[in-house]
Amino acid sequence: MSLDVPGKGMDINLRLYLVRHGETDWNVESRIQGKTDIELNEKGRQQAEGLADVLKKGYGIRRIYTSRQKRAAETAEIIGQRLGIRPEVREGLEEINFGKWEGHTWRQVRELFPQEYFVWHGNRRYEVPPEGESYQQLLDRLLPALDNIMRRDRQDVLSITHSAVIMTLMSYLNDTPFEDMARNYKTGNTQIVELDQDLFYQRYKRN
């Protein structure tokens, strides 16, 4: 498929799949992880192994990229071992930085940071949690990373990343409220989401 973007004439035939990492103990405890570097739990490792089997049978993955964070990198490593592919760390795929809110549940955040949460909740795309980053700042690093991947590769690609990354991207591409992202695009551990490249470039070049 040819896209009228910088470097037009470039054919992009690959499929790009985004996958959320496997389960962690903080997922089970409903604690906000963000940039905090939490490892997979045993169930998370089993989920990664199960996904690897699915990918090996039904997908033509030729390259694997991953966030640098342990929960993503370990998921990628397990899958890569099954597929015979060495994962590459790609900057920009990291989870959103929730700053001082990390380690807490959302209920605790509302109790401990009532004013900050109120302001953030009403304008999630642009408001920044204490010592964290906004969803727009996440987009500012994510979109160029995905663009670079699609310009570099000509074969099917797997990118291991995080829930807020996927939900933020889907909200941006579909032009839906960022406040509704969890309702609209909730992503389970090791869930596969295929990136619509036409939609990506329609939005990316326009903005």
Where are these predicted regions, by residue range?
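Extreme N-terminal starter segment of soluble prokaryotic enzymes
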Residues: 11-17
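Glycine-rich phosphate-binding loop signature in dinucleotide/nucleotide-binding domains
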Residues: 57-60, 149-156
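Short beta-strand scaffold positions
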Residues: 66-67, 140, 160-161
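Active-site-proximal alpha-helix that buttresses catalytic centers in soluble enzyme cores
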Residues: 3, 14, 23-89
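Short active-site segment of divalent metal-dependent hydrolases/proteases
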Residues: 24, 165-166
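Domain-level recognition of soluble alpha/beta enzyme cores
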Residues: 176-202
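Generic beta-sheet signal
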Residues: 16, 153-164
